[in-house]
From Swiss-Prot:
It comes from Mus musculus (Mouse). Component of the THO subcomplex of the TREX complex which is thought to couple mRNA transcription, processing and nuclear export, and which specifically associates with spliced mRNA and not with unspliced pre-mRNA. Plays a key structural role in the oligomerization of the THO-DDX39B complex. It is found in: Nucleus; Nucleus speckle. This is THO complex subunit 6 homolog. PANTHER family: THO COMPLEX SUBUNIT 6 HOMOLOG. WD repeats lie at residues 22-61, 74-112, 124-165, 166-205, 215-254, 256-293, 295-339. Signal peptide: none annotated. The lineage of its organism: Eukaryota, Metazoa, Chordata, Craniata, Vertebrata. Component of the THO subcomplex, which is composed of THOC1, THOC2, THOC3, THOC5, THOC6 and THOC7. The THO subcomplex interacts with DDX39B to form the THO-DDX39B complex which multimerizes into a 28-subunit tetrameric assembly. Component of the transcription/export (TREX) complex at least composed of ALYREF/THOC4, DDX39B, SARNP/CIP29, CHTOP and the THO subcomplex; in the complex interacts with THOC5; together with THOC5 and THOC7, plays a key structural role in the oligomerization of the THO-DDX39B complex. TREX seems to have a dynamic structure involving ATP-dependent remodeling. GO terms for biological process: apoptotic process; central nervous system development; mRNA export from nucleus; mRNA processing; RNA splicing. GO terms for cellular component: chromosome, telomeric region; nuclear speck; nucleus; THO complex part of transcription export complex. The keyword Ribosomal protein does not apply. Pfam families: WD40.
Length: 341
């Protein structure tokens, strides 16, 4: 039996541990800073890394520019979701949401500003919080996940003001219809539910898997991603990625992709989606696949569009998932480079 040649420089235990961590890393969530120049990425080890987009995109960028400017331990379990307000980074893990001041994070001071736990039915419950959604009109935050409820939190007082119940299994994703304001939620039960926040009630239910053109029983009924644009919604997961007219609850376009999709977003006249497989898919609303742009991860879980007006030079699409890398697309048509934990 042949033996591998010994390494010239023996790696210390810490280096071996870090290499193994990177090998098995999943980046679940991303959020752009209010100034548009930094990107936060949260992984399965409870770490949040802050990358400088402005440094990585600079003409003088070096390899070091693609590494985090700071990494800190935020949660005991995975960082499933993150959003940013004009001052704060909010992160969600198992059973709680935490608030961090962007200004302090960037000074490399990583103390949480506050933490909140939604009122769960039993003290033994520690369900994951899969999705966070800001509702600017009422200065609130919606949290949803493993306890099958949507919890609304007042961002000024930190108080939980209501719980919306209707899902029969855990919730994967949230989206906002701003004009109303109404919130859409998608879950493991195969339903997309529409909630009117003014009356705190469910006003519409679409059971996607019951529509023959969308149903894919071999993949299950779960809804893993959704996005909305006025009267239109796109959602996918177990069922096919499909564009819906909300007012009539009608599926209008079924997108021809077999792999379950984990993230979807409207962008200009396109729909961008990603999931199993390394590609970011660009769809016309008609269902035509305009482009498939490969990235460096074998599967994608999160897409983030940096459209902060304060930093037009940092206008990029970033994609992350089953690796330690965040792919950066400066032009939607190709991957320019990758940031790495």
């Amino acid at each position: 039996m042949e033996h591998a040649a010994p390494l010239a420089v023996p790696l210390g235990q810490a280096e071996v541990f870090q290499a193994l961590q990177r090998l098995h890393m999943t980046i679940f969530s991303q959020s752009v800073s209010p100034c548009g120049k930094f990107l936060a990425a949260g992984n399965n080890y409870g770490q949040i890394a802050i990358f400088s987009l402005s440094a990585a995109l600079s003409s003088e960028a070096k390899e070091e520019s693609k590494k985090p400017v700071v990494v800190f331990h935020a949660h005991d379990g995975p960082v499933y979701s993150m959003v940013s307000t004009d001052r704060h980074l909010l992160s969600a893990g198992d059973g709680e949401v935490k608030g961090w001041l962007w200004a302090e994070i960037l000074k490399k001071g990583c103390k949480e500003l506050w933490r909140r736990q939604p009122p769960y039915r039993t003290s033994l419950e520690v369900p994951e919080i899969n999705a966070l959604l800001l509702v600017p009109k009422e200065n609130s935050l919606i949290l949803a996940g493993g306890d099958c409820q949507l919890h609304s939190m007042d961002l000024e007082t930190g108080a939980f003001t209501r719980a919306l119940r209707g899902h029969t299994d855990y919730i994967h994703c949230l989206a906002l219809r701003e004009r109303s304001p109404e919130v859409l939620s998608g879950g493991e039960d195969g339903a997309v539910r529409l909630w009117d926040l003014r009356i705190a009630k469910e006003v519409q239910t679409i059971e996607v898997y019951k529509h023959e053109e969308c149903s894919r029983p071999h993949n299950g009924r779960w809804i893993g991603c959704l996005a909305t644009d006025s009267d239109w919604m796109v959602c996918g997961g177990g069922p096919a990625l499909t564009l819906w007219h909300l007012r009539s609850s009608t599926p209008t376009t079924v997108f021809p992709i077999r792999a379950p999709q984990k993230h979807v977003t409207f962008y200009q006249d396109l729909i961008l989606s990603a999931g199993q497989g390394c590609c970011v898919n660009h769809w016309q609303l008609s269902g035509e696949l305009k482009a498939q742009v490969p990235g460096s991860s074998p599967g994608l879980l999160s897409l983030s569009l940096n459209q902060q007006p304060a930093a037009p030079e940092c206008k990029v699409l970033t994609a992350s998932g089953n690796s330690c890398r965040v792919d950066v697309f400066t032009n939607l048509g190709y991957r320019a480079f990758s940031l790495s934990f």
